[in-house]
Regions:
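Active-site beta-strand/loop architecture of penicillin-binding DD-peptidases
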Residues: 1-59, 67, 76-166
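Short, highly charged C-terminal tails/helix-capping segments
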Residues: 166-194
Length: 194
C-alpha cells in the first residue's frame, strides 16, 4: 500500500461496505457504543398474524465507550443545527446526522459520486436511523447534506409521527441559514471564481 492509498484509507475512501454495515456502525456510535446484530425483521408472524418468534436485540460487542458515544451524539446534532446537515432539521425533534460525499471506486467517470446522509432521531434518545444514499446524482451541489439530508428529514419525520414519538423543545438554531452558510457557486461556476 502506497502513501496515497494509505491516506485515502484513513478517511474511508478506499473502503467498500454495505449500507446495512454503515447503518449498523452508526447505530453503535449513537447507542452507547454497542455494536448490535442487525435484523431486517423483529418478529416472525404465523398465518393468523400471531407472533411465532421475536428476535431480541443481541449485542455483538462494545466498540466505543459510553462517553465517546455521548460526545459523538453531540457532534452529530451540531452538524444538523449549525453545519452541513441543516437540511435534516425537523421541527420539534432533536436530530443528529452526518453527510458523506464519496467518489465511486469502480467508475470510469472520475466525477461519479455517491451523496449520502445518515440521520438519527431523537438524538438525545436514539430510536430511529435513516440512511439515504444517492448514486451519481445529476445536480449541483452533489453533497449529501444538500441532496440526501432533506430526504432523511422527510422519512424520519413521517416515521417519528407514525411511531407516536412526541415532539419536544429543541436547542436554539441560528436565526437564518444565511448567517452560517457559505456562498455556493452558481451552476457551472467553481469556488475559486474560475
Amino acid at each position: 500500500m502506497g502513501p496515497v492509498e494509505l491516506a485515502s484509507c484513513a478517511f474511508g475512501q478506499s473502503s467498500k461496505i454495505s449500507y446495512l454495515e454503515m447503518a449498523s456502525a452508526v447505530c453503535a456510535v449513537v447507542n452507547g457504543g454497542r455494536l448490535m446484530q442487525p435484523y431486517v425483521v423483529s418478529d416472525i408472524l404465523g398465518p393468523e398474524g400471531e407472533v411465532i418468534d421475536h428476535l431480541s436485540p443481541i449485542c455483538k460487542r462494545q466498540v466505543l465507550k459510553e462517553e465517546t458515544s455521548r460526545t459523538m451524539r453531540e457532534m452529530m446534532e451540531a452538524v444538523v443545527l449549525y453545519g452541513g446537515g441543516r437540511n435534516a432539521r425537523i421541527a420539534g425533534y432533536r436530530v443528529g446526522g452526518k453527510s458523506g460525499t464519496s467518489q465511486k471506486l469502480d467508475s470510469a467517470d472520475e466525477k461519479a459520486r455517491i451523496a449520502s446522509f445518515v440521520a438519527v432521531a431523537p438524538i438525545d434518545d436514539p430510536q430511529l436511523l435513516c440512511l439515504v444514499c444517492l448514486d451519481e446524482p445529476h445536480s449541483w451541489p452533489t453533497a449529501g447534506g444538500s441532496l440526501s439530508a432533506p430526504v432523511c428529514a422527510e422519512v424520519l419525520e413521517q416515521t417519528l409521527v407514525y411511531k407516536g414519538i412526541p415532539r419536544a423543545a429543541v436547542p436554539d438554531t441560528p436565526a437564518s441559514d444565511a448567517e452560517t452558510s457559505a456562498d455556493l457557486p452558481e451552476d457551472g461556476d467553481s469556488f475559486d471564481g474560475a
